[in-house]
Amino acid sequence: MTFLPRSRAIRIGFRPAVAAFVASLLVCAFAWAAPAASGDELQLAIILTRHGVRSPLKTNEAMARLASQPWPSWEVAPGIQTPRGNALIALMGDYYRARFAEAGALTGDPAVDGPRVFIRADNDQRTIETGRILGKSLVRLGEPDVHSLAAGTADPLFRPVRAHVGHPDVARAVAAVLGRIGGDPRRLDRAYAAQLAELKGILFGPGGAPLGASPFDEPTTVRPGDQESLVTISGPIYFAEQCTESFVLEYADGMPASDVGWGRVDERALTDLLALHELFFDLAQRTYYPAQVGGSNLASHIIDTLEQAALGQPVPGAVGPSGERVVVLVGHDTNIANVGGLFGMNWMIPGTQANPLVPGGALVFELWKRGGEQNSFYVR
């Protein structure tokens, strides 16, 4: 089955209707911003979500050199969504169902709502499982169809660099990141010295110093990326992102406090350390040119899907058939960072840093029809 008729970067010359949507998206906030006016009707909701809580992508053996104590064990293999991750995603689905039923996009009747929901996921276990659980919670009608490409296929919607969508300029991407930090990545090590020192104290215990050579002794560098990303950031900032991501996953999975950062990471410390995590993604994924390359194809299909709902007829490039009321796109933290950077979106969640990329977090695009006006829509 073909889900996307074409893959491409955002066009320079938009059709008038699409240009209006883009202007709305650039001005509007994400998720639920200002309340809709009385009498307005929700025509379509597009949920761009990260998968749920998973185990770290790297094995404990691969992470061993980053700490003086063994990392906690997980009940699932690396990169697999956990049972608690499944349960938390189900709660998100319950929330979306209640909200969209109240707004009129869903009815609460599974037989009616089933055909109104379309789910498109990347082909990892964690993304497919998130789509499946969200679909069950949204509709409550058996097992939903989760549309994805064959396993092992680089999906141009979620992994455009690996799928070779377009011809990105790697040197330009590196220059764009370096331009934000004065051309010297070592400035990051100095600017975030306090957070790095706190992290090393957690990783290596009192004194924050390993017995031998530490990867944190290497300076941060910025260079051309690999098949997944245009830009590679290595050194302390990269290792800090890996470690803080592990702490977030341990905490979100409900591990005992003694296992979250070996008992040395409480909520305050986790909030502080997230500054290092979000710094990495802000530079590598939200810098405008990398965000444009990584997010423009996905954003273009989102815009086509909004246009299809407004016109009430099929539009090439739209995700799902005409008539859907909820479209779920299940991807990764990089997808949310790319689209957020492309559209200039910023968000805050209590207990985190700016623009957090939490498991199960989402950007939600809503198309509303103005009450009492013919063919008048807005996006928020």
Regions found by a protein language model. Give the residues of each.
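N-terminal secretory signal peptides that target proteins for export/translocation
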Residues: M1-F14
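Intrinsically disordered, low-complexity segments enriched in Ser/Pro/Gly/Ala and basic residues
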Residues: L4-R6, A23, A37, A213
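Intrinsically disordered, low-complexity Ser/Thr- and Pro-rich stretches
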Residues: P5-S7, A19, T153-A154
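Intrinsically disordered, low-complexity regions enriched in Ser/Pro/Gly/Gln/His and often acidic
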Residues: R8, L25, A64-A67
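Bacterial N-terminal signal peptides
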Residues: A17-A29
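Signal peptide processing junction and immediate N-terminal pro/mature segment
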Residues: A31-A36
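Signature for phosphate-centric chemistry
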Residues: A37-R116, D122-V327, G331-R380
